[in-house]
């Protein structure tokens, strides 16, 4: 709990009483994809920050919790339609995975406990540096069929000096199975790990 002194100018309403209009947002929630987890339990997810739906500003968070989620349906994307993964967050006992400690432009970050890591489909992998990324074949790890699977993709363009670090390269789904299910990359797939030459990029 935090107290913060502020000055507000009330407005006299038609009933001649002074009133304040106050807008408070004390929580937010959403479904995203886990990108990486270190041996120490630090994780990164989502691939972009959580923004206020009304203002578009990056939300400042004091604390958060990470829970298991399930994808229950896919709205296929197409021309003029972004498509999305629909699912639910399981807040039941024992489904909490960890904490959310930072909300930044490139994603949300926090810690996952040792015991909770055992629930996740993990595999150890090297990190690819940006100078190692090249155009050509790659894979996207994502869950659209009830489990995490690798799907073929193509890195079509690289932007090494792009001002927005979220736009380091362009990727196109080439896997016929994934195209048949989602039509390409849809909302909810942000943060899906991209693998090239056996490394997480």
What does each model-identified segment do?
Residues 1-201:
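C-terminal recognition in membrane/secretory proteostasis and scaffolding
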């Amino acid at each position: 709990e935090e107290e913060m002194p502020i000055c507000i100018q009330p407005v006299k309403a038609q009933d001649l009483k002074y009133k304040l209009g106050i807008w408070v947002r004390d929580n937010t929630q959403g479904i995203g994809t886990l990108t990486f987890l270190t041996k120490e339990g630090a994780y990164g997810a989502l691939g972009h920050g959580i923004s206020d739906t009304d203002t578009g500003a990056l939300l400042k968070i004091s604390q958060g919790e990470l829970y298991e989620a399930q994808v229950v349906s896919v709205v296929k994307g197409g021309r003029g339609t972004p498509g999305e993964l629909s699912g639910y967050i399981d807040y039941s006992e024992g489904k909490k995975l960890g904490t959310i400690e930072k909300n930044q432009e490139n994603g949300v970050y926090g810690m996952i406990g040792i015991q909770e890591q055992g629930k996740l489909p993990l595999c150890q992998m090297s990190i690819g540096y940006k100078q190692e990324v090249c155009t050509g074949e790659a894979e996207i790890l994502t869950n659209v069929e009830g489990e995490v699977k690798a799907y073929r993709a193509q890195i079509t363009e690289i932007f090494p000096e792009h001002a927005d670090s979220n736009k380091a390269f362009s990727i196109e789904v080439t896997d016929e199975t994934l195209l048949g299910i989602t039509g390409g990359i849809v909302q909810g797939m942000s943060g899906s790990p991209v693998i090239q030459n056996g490394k997480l990029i």
